[in-house]
């Protein structure tokens, strides 16, 4: 127990990969933590995130020792607009356990999905975009490099998904197959100095007899552009299972579209005690065309887009008319005239 507390202290003393607003020049992903950031991956960005983990569990009351292998995966895609993404997120786990009360006991095995969820996330509020549009304070270096009251206002998103759970699954409360909802409220604060605070409020399996309610708090620090550290606390409670989990780790940006990571998970209870190590990576296919200003919404946004569309149509019509006149009357298209010397003909 003492060694586990020491390890926990180390994790908390350190400071998920760097997460920033909307589409970014480098990959924006949720690994290696368990929380969801408030921002989407960006329109037309397809992103794959996955990892592999090994762990050990010991249950004091059941007298069992378990060796576990898990694979977690996530596929995320931004579509229609910058604020929206759809995703498939899940974890598959295989356990091999023995009864420690029996000498030379045979190992028993069980495997299934701990979670498998299809859902969508929408960014409801982004306080950072307007600041980017306004630009920095040109009269005060200090104002641009200190935490301000405005930094306490987070970006907010809502996630809604459906859990697909199979029959006779030892990792879920239901004995039969079911499809049930999951809701997540995510907030994200980006602070000066490369610090990010993410919080998730979670309501899971809320239509079942044993719903789960919980939270995740993640703190990220990026001391450089290619390296980041994180610590995380997750708590959840239901009649089926309750726990407090602590995670910590680091991630390295190999290229703007590729990141690798390593992390550790532990808890402080003994029914069961849990200790896991994980490695993983994330890669994105960046088909993003242009960044949108999210404030261009509603009537103002429609008028702006209508005006831009009208300008494009006007230019096309003008060019078409000029081409027709040039063909019929050998007139020079003013759009194509380079303004050069006429060779002295006039």
Each predicted region: which residue ranges?
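Bacterial Sec-dependent N-terminal signal peptides
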Residues: 1-27
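Transmembrane beta-barrel domains of Gram-negative outer membranes and organellar outer membranes
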Residues: 22-206, 210-263, 267-346
């Amino acid at each position: 127990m003492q060694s586990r507390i020491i390890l926990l202290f180390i994790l908390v003393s350190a400071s998920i990969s760097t997460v920033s607003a909307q589409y970014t020049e480098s990959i924006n992903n949720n690994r290696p933590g368990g929380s969801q950031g408030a921002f989407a991956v960006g329109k037309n960005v397809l992103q794959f995130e996955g990892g592999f983990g090994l762990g050990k569990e010991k249950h004091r009351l059941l007298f069992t020792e378990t060796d576990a292998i898990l694979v977690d995966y996530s596929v995320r895609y931004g579509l229609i607009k910058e604020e929206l993404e759809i995703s498939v997120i899940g974890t598959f786990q295989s356990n091999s356990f023995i009864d420690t009360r029996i000498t030379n006991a045979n190992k028993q095995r069980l495997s299934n999905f701990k979670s498998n969820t299809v859902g969508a996330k929408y960014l409801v509020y982004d306080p950072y975009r307007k600041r980017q549009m306004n630009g920095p304070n040109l009269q005060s270096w200090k104002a641009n490099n200190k935490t301000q009251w405005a930094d306490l206002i987070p970006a907010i998103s809502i996630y809604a998904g459906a859990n697909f759970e199979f029959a006779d699954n030892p990792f879920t409360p239901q004995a039969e197959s079911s499809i049930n909802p999951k809701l997540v409220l995510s907030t994200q604060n980006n602070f000066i100095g490369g610090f990010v605070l993410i919080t998730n409020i979670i309501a899971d399996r809320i239509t079942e007899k044993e719903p789960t309610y919980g939270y995740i708090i993640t703190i990220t620090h990026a001391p450089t552009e290619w390296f980041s550290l994180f610590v995380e606390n997750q708590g959840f409670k239901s009649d089926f299972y309750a726990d407090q989990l602590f995670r910590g780790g680091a991630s390295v940006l190999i290229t703007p579209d590729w990141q690798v990571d390593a992390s550790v998970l532990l808890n402080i209870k003994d029914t069961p005690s849990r200790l896991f190590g994980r490695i993983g990576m994330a890669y994105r296919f960046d088909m993003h065309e242009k960044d949108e200003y999210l404030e261009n919404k509603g009537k103002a946004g429609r008028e702006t887009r209508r005006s831009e569309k009208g300008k494009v149509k006007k230019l096309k019509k003008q060019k078409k008319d000029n081409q027709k006149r040039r063909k019929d009357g050998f007139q020079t298209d003013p759009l194509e005239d380079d303004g050069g010397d006429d060779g002295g003909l006039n």
